């Protein structure tokens, strides 16, 4: 009898509450913080998409139009303009493959940290055949108690 009681208790406590099951068709709602930017223009700037996504994809999770200055990310379901807090990027720009740097951004209670690794770099001085540097990036976003880290890839240039 005690064994049956323990079995029933374990089944009750291992099943999600019915309200959570109904919220998303039987699954617990996602806690994803970083989404796809809704507004993306073509032209010079920095564009990053989730790692592994097709290179022709326009699903960017970070977008910075060189003419607008303030980058965009979709955080918690809405596009947010970020302001740069700090950067360890060399003043003259990245000079070699494998070089690392980071940037920190904020917008209200939203904090973003981006860690860059250069995958390909345009040789200096100006070379019209090389239009962008490519990077692998780790992006960590936090808003209040929520936090998410994603891997991304893309580049900066024209």
What are these regions (language model features)?
Residues 16-18:
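N-terminal Sec signal peptide cleavage junction
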Residues 3-14:
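Bacterial N-terminal signal peptides
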Residues 20-158:
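Cysteine-centric segments in proteins
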């Amino acid at each position: 009898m005690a064994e049956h009681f323990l079995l029933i208790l374990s089944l009750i406590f291992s099943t999600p509450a019915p309200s959570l099951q109904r919220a998303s068709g039987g699954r617990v709602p996602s806690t994803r913080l970083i989404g796809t930017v809704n507004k993306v223009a073509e032209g010079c700037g920095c564009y990053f998409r989730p790692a592994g996504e097709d290179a022709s994809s326009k699903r960017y999770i970070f977008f910075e139009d060189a003419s607008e200055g303030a980058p965009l990310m979709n955080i918690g379901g809405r596009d947010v303009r970020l302001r740069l807090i700090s950067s360890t990027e060399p003043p003259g720009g990245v000079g070699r493959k494998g070089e690392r740097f980071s940037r920190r951004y904020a917008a209200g209670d939203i904090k973003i940290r981006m860690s860059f690794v250069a995958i390909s770099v345009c040789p200096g001085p100006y070379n019209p055949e090389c239009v962008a540097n490519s990077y692998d990036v780790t992006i960590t976003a936090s808003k209040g108690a929520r936090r998410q880290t994603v891997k991304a890839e893309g580049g900066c240039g024209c």
